[in-house]
């Protein structure tokens, strides 16, 4: 993804204006840790640009691209009839911080909330009516996002953030996701694994080094993803009997 600073600045202004119009404020609190950047700080950098050596700014570059991408997805669906369902999620997002190079804590609700907003926006951008589980007032029994067909559940999506490399943890996530989908009443569903915590940024951008061509880190990322896919495929094949009984 190539982002021009002028375009990023305009997008940051539009994103903040949209949030303000929906009653969502972005508190300018102090940084909460070396690995976390509050949303206001990232938007500020998108406006002003990034200065410094790559090692010092790798967190800000990464966060800037991520927030720019999310903001673009949200702005693309601001006229969708289901947009107000995103507001509680956006409120929660603005009150938290963006975890970057380190693995987020297990209770990082704001981090987990990112993928739900992102996927809902992708569906809405394609004209799909959605039902979004509330980010706070929810017992966790329902899928995170449900695509509707004439108001009825058609396809359910359960997102699971994978932090542990152990296969049993993956299986537990998969079973819980299948159970959530079955309770939704949808005819079909997808359990999607959020694998970002398993990709350590240090492997993609080693300290003290840089790439002259983006295809080098892209190839590393692809290899890491392929390794994870192989692991996930092995988990499902090994436990197919248990899954078929759900």
Model regions and ranges:
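Charged, structured surface patches that assemble and position nucleic-acid processing machinery
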Residues: 1-126, 160-246
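Conserved catalytic cores of phosphodiester-cleaving nucleases, focusing on short active-site segments
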Residues: 123, 144-163
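A short acidic/basic microdomain associated with nuclease active sites
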Residues: 125-148
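An acidic- and aromatic-residue-enriched active-site/binding cleft used to recognize and process polar
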Residues: 135-138, 150, 160-162, 196
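Residue-level preference for short coil/turn positions at secondary-structure junctions
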Residues: 141, 152, 185-187
């Amino acid at each position: 993804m190539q982002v021009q600073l002028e375009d990023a600045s305009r997008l940051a202004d539009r994103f903040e204006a949209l949030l303000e119009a929906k009653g969502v404020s972005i508190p300018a609190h102090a940084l909460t840790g070396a690995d976390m950047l509050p949303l206001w700080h990232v938007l500020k950098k998108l406006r002003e640009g990034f200065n410094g050596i790559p090692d010092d700014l790798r967190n800000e570059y990464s966060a800037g691209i991520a927030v720019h991408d999310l903001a673009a997805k949200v702005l693309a669906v601001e006229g969708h009839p289901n947009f107000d369902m995103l507001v509680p999620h956006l409120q929660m997002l603005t009150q938290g911080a963006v975890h970057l190079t380190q693995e987020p804590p297990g209770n990082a609700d704001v981090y987990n909330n990112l993928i739900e907003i992102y996927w809902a926006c992708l569906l809405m951008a394609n004209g799909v009516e959605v039902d979004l589980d509330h980010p706070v007032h929810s017992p966790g029994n329902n899928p995170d996002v449900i695509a509707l067909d004439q108001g009825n559940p058609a396809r359910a999506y359960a997102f699971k953030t994978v932090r542990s490399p152990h296969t049993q943890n993956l299986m537990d996530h998969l079973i819980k996701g299948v159970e959530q989908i079955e309770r939704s009443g949808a005819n079909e569903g997808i359990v999607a694994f959020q694998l970002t915590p398993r990709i350590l940024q240090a492997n993609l951008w080693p300290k003290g080094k840089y790439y002259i061509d983006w295809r080098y880190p892209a190839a590393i990322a692809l290899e890491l993803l392929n390794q994870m896919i192989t692991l996930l495929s092995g988990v499902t094949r090994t436990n197919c009997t248990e899954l078929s009984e759900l």
